[in-house]
Amino acid sequence: MNESELKLQFGKPLQITPRLHIKQPTIKEIEKMDGKYEKYLSLLITQSRDIADVLWVKANIFYEDIKSEWLFFIKNCIVDGEAAPIYILKNDSYIQMNDAGLVINKEYTDALNYFFETDGIWFTSSITACGIQQLVLINAKEKHGIYYLDSNDKPLQINESVYNNMVDGLAKLNWIKKEYQFTKGGTKDATTYFLEMEYRKRIKKKKDRITISTIFSSLVAKGHRYKDVKKYPVYFFYESYFRLLKISEYENTMQALYNGCIDTKNHPINYEKIDWSSIIK
């Protein structure tokens, strides 16, 4: 994933493998989805640490005991999955596969198909690569209720490496930076105490403080044209918001400096940090 920032600002998809890319919608397209975008995004990027408090309080599962986020993801995919036969189409004949697993549930299928701009279904399978057995998701076509792979085409696959790239890519496109305060707890007892506190905060929290809607309003209030913001690719939309915060920080610092509110001798200004045209970290 070496996509330049400029390409992402221009709305280009994020390539994660030679054959798989992540779709980058505009804000107008997201609005038309009526909440499905946020739902699909959450399904694909949520990992054990993101719901560590829920896992501990509701299921008595400690997040550090989950050794593989990939297997955790697969487990969620196959809840209500379907044990359906998968066929290989060869010379106009359907031959049933022997090593096909479960067809993943509709929610995860829709999420993967949306972001990867694919269709059909995804099913689990165990393959051997470089002498190592791996669990993968394979994309199959669907016709008249029959799930099949075309013997003339190499099917799309998601393995653990592709999954990790997908999570990182979606976080990059949507400017999601994950921080976990409970990991600073030290001992397990201290950590679980923090998790229980986090859970209490979660159930009291009615809605997010900052949303796509509030960012949209902020950009318009700061002079971005309404009709232009609707056309912003999601990466540029968030980048514009965080750039706006850097500009505000710079303006506030300069105003305080002009009014003599900053003792620059004892508290020198880090101009590199407040440079609003610098790379946002």
Locate each region found by the language model.
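General structural signal for secondary-structure boundaries
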Residues: 26, 108, 119-120, 128, ...
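Protein-protein interaction interfaces in oligomeric scaffolds
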Residues: 35-37, 42, 48, 53-127, ...
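Long, intrinsically disordered, low-complexity Ser/Thr/Pro-rich regulatory/activation regions
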Residues: 257-281
